Amino acid sequence: MLRHKNGSWRLCNTLIDVLCLRAERQPEDSACSFLRDGEQDEVDVSYRELERQARAVGAWLQQNVASAGQRVLILIPPGLDFLAGFFGCVYGGMIAVPAYPPHSTRRTRLLSRLEAIAENAAPAAVFTTAELLPAVRQIFERTCRCHAIDNLLATEASELSDRWTSPAVSAQSLAMLQYTSGSTGAPNGVMLSHGNLLDNSEQIRLYYEHSQASRVFSWLPPYHDMGLIGCILQPLYLGCPLQLMSPMHFLQQPIRWLRAISDWKATTSGGPNFAYDLCVDRFDSGECAGLDLSTWSVAFNGAEPVRAQTLDRFAATFEPYGFRREAFYPCYGLAEGTLMVSGGWKTAAPVIEHVQADDLGTGRVVSVPVTSTGVQSLVSCGRSIPGQELKIVDPERCTECPPATVGEIWIRGPSVTHGYWQRPGLTKATFEAFMADTGAGPYLRTGDLGFLKDGELFVTGRLKDLIILDGRNHYPQDIELTVEQSHPGIRRGCCVAFSVDQRGAERLVVLAEVDRAYWSGARMEDRASKRENGELHDADERSVTLNRRSLILKAIRRAVSEKHEARVAEVLLLKPASIAKTPSGKHQRRACREAFLKGALREV
């Protein structure tokens, strides 16, 4: 249900109901604006116009696709055309399949992912843009119909919108397939119903304390749950303003994100942990003149481990510009749970728990003072959303863990989705878990590890990524953080740790990308020093490089040994962009491990 300006209630079972309602109640209000250059070049669309576009695209699908319930692949760059494509699929009674469009600089990686998605989803049609249509046709023309949505909207929208007929969809009907990032394997299509999307939208509204006075800004990719459900569907559900920016414009200049929040007076915006680190790493006080972040009341942080150090760095850097530490909103979610699983209090600062790292490695949670030796600071991801049951479960025994114990996070509730498209075996293993002692269920096995304390959820890592050395558990993200902090030449967020079997024992392997600018600068510095001391006569580029490599390798091994009491069996120093990541920026540890075992990684 949705509350409206006049205080009345109206039942909405589908996304079609919601957009129709907005076009009826707020026809001239802006549904979305988009910064085409990431700064000032703004275009927008009203609810009335977006609903008209959705009808037109839906009618085209009804005329050109065999039957309702077919999958439609959406390969459209971020912007207003994406919204028309997504809602057009919904209005046509189809199942939307958003995915990254082919891009020349990432063509090989994206092509293999697209092929895997297409093989599983078997789309009946593909929507893209006129600019990308030739490339998309090369990939898909033999298997399905490809169409440029901008051409359709420019030439046929008025005529088509009158031909639309409301499809027979309900809350139980599938609205979209959300393909997982593939951080632990091939992408799987999570089946989300209209009911899933509306239920989770309501939970987000409650936990963010949103209203029609809220203002949402996002640079997040619309192809993933956080960008699409949390930042595009949420404002539509609320009837509040939304402004978007391309992820590329953010990555090129992170200040654009903060400047947009300031200029547009956004109340809600956020991203993964790395986005906050990037803002601090690229901080330039000269670019921040006049910056005002005082309206930013929900700075959500999720999709990857939330680091206490990141929160401290960002708050210290941007508090002079009006940012409040209480605005930080760490949260936890996953596509299989639609999006949000847990979140904190809007007006409270994040909850930090300081624990003994050694005990955490054995699955025990022992709280200690922050000044203790071997302390690890964990950020709470808040409390379970209303109407959902969340338990910490022993993943092998399938029984609930005792207090102060790490286990797998299991959930059940109306936001839990319908399984994986065309993957019955994986669906049963993941979505149909039962307690061994009580028979309670079914639960969704998230594959994530964590613990509860005073109702707060602390996520510690991924079950499949866990590294076990000499009987002790190590979370790869903890080792990766230690590695990246061990030497200034290592790129932030570009380290991977995993284990391999060597002669019947698990051994630790670390991959670390070396910063190109630092490497070049260090090399020049060494050469200048040798030249000044008259030592350059027999020193060539290779000897200088080997010297720098040795320093970094020693720093990594020493840091991991001291912090984790673990021996690194092998370290590979790599060029930037060598480490495999998902389109959303998560490490693909399994792919990295396979590349290592195949000898496919090239060291600097």
Predicted segment positions?
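Gly/Ser/Thr-rich phosphate-binding loop
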Residues: 266-270, 282-375, 389, 397-398
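AMP-binding/adenylate-forming catalytic domain of the ANL superfamily
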Residues: 493-494, 506, 558-587, 600-604
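Conserved ANL (AMP-binding/adenylate-forming) active-site segment centered on the GW(Y/F)…HTG consensus within
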Residues: 357-378, 396-399, 416-447, 480
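Conserved AMP-binding/adenylation subdomain of ANL enzymes
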Residues: 198-215, 225-267, 282-287
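AMP-binding/adenylate-forming catalytic core of the ANL superfamily
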Residues: 126, 262, 269, 413, ...
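Conserved pre-ATP/AMP-binding loop-to-beta segment of ANL
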Residues: 27-30, 160-186, 196, 200, ...
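Conserved beta-loop-beta connector loops within the AMP-binding
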Residues: 364-410, 454
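Conserved AMP-binding/adenylate-forming core of the ANL superfamily
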Residues: 32-84, 104-112, 168, 189-198
